[in-house]
């Protein structure tokens, strides 16, 4: 019987070049008679039968590999069967079935594509190691990629440039780039995938390389290059995600982190991340505590509470499948300097991170110098780099009205270029970026008139009022306490009198207290008062006799001298 089956096998192999259909029929006859005829299963694979059952039977009978071929005096290389091992990286990466290991590789990759990750990994357990470590590493990288375990993909392909199989080494570069992109490491992904485009694997992996390069470049702000790649994909390898990305410039790759991968309750299920909300809850508590600590700012606190409530309810409605108005998260903080705008911006960053709207409670403080360059065409580049630093957090632009300045009655072209870039990124990165612009109300209004699209980008405007004289006193006391200092009653009275005077005077059309800087004015008074106190105490002949009260107290004379000094320095004296 063995000789008969061997004869049938030899006939089938001989027919493969002329009639694969007839060859497949003969290989099938053999396997119907003997399910352990591994070589016939391999023949079926060589004829295009890569059904799961076929792959399983070939793998299950792999210990019989070469027996029929040996009896027929045929080399298994002569069968010419190849098995797909590219997985998510390419349908065109195949490997010659010249050993039981090749069968195992193909079977494991197919099992992973069906979501049977554990079976796939178990199939590799008895794979021969000596001399074939790179093959096993590649298949593991494919399995981990199918399960979106990107950190382990990188572990498997690290050092692939030393693999003896240069084609698979190049494919490993693609796997590394794909993993980097899914981890949000877009610069590294761009580098790896660009290099892969100049290797033997470029054609086999072309759709994957183009897709992830497009997503990496879009996330880096290179929309023009992303569009070129997406259009090429649409023309050659159309699929729904490509169409969606072409239609919506805000379409982004959904990334993860090593921490999230490690937090999965099921290592193969990306949706099984056990959410640890304690850090977010802590951010919300800290944000509320910081807001409560602020003196005055009644209207601001109410508006921040409304902003938080609207954002929180929108997240809850969306989670329950309800319609949610797509309102902008960008904000305007309008008001004089020293009224707590930067502090409240930090509160907003904590709130948004606590609610999961942004990735981290990051606040990037900026001004005109971070956006506007000295040469034409460079402001766009500079602006994009600044925005990239803020992605995943909040970009705070103080004195935003200085972005675009008038020059001899003409609009500043460099500032306009920066503003145009900012507007585009605010829209394209709206899911990863919150922008807060700050400045005097009238100046902010003038900025909003510069560009027609600017005003519509901001759904929330919060007005910051000047501090009252009483609030300046309270702020001064808080600042002093933080420094282990204390204003005596006379010193506090001096601060109240000075603040009242400034609130009733105008300089250049603005309240003198605003020119002085409100809260910053209070800090300068306290710091100058501490200096005067220290100079007074330094004249004491007996330092050991100085008590804590004496070392901390700022008296009326100390503060009177401080007020005179600060007013002179700020040029706001009588």
Swiss-Prot record:
Places the protein is found: Cytoplasm
Note: DNA conjugation in M.smegmatis is unidirectional with distinct donor and recipient strains; mc(2)155 is a donor strain while MKD8 is a recipient strain. Mutations in a donor strain that alter DNA transfer do not always alter DNA transfer in a recipient strain.
Keywords: ATP-binding, Cytoplasm, Nucleotide-binding, Transport
Assembly and binders: Part of the ESX-1 / type VII secretion system (T7SS), which is composed of cytosolic and membrane components.
Gene knockout outcome: Increases efficiency of DNA conjugation when disrupted in donor strain. Loss of DNA conjugation when disrupted in recipient strain No effect on secretion of EsxA or EsxB. EsxB secretion was not seen in this disruption in strain MDK8.
The species this protein was found in: Mycolicibacterium smegmatis (strain ATCC 700084 / mc(2)155)
Domain of life, per lineage: Bacteria
A single cellular component GO annotation: cytoplasm
Entry protein name: ESX-1 secretion system protein EccA1
Record-stated family: Belongs to the CbxX/CfxQ family.
Binding site for ATP: 335-342
Function, in words: Part of the ESX-1 / type VII specialized secretion system (T7SS), which exports several proteins including EsxA and EsxB. Plays a role in DNA conjugation, in both donor and recipient strains. EccA1 exhibits ATPase activity and may provide energy for the export of ESX-1 substrates.
Coiled coil spans: none
GO MF annotations in UniProt: ATP binding; ATP hydrolysis activity
Chain ranges passing through the membrane: none
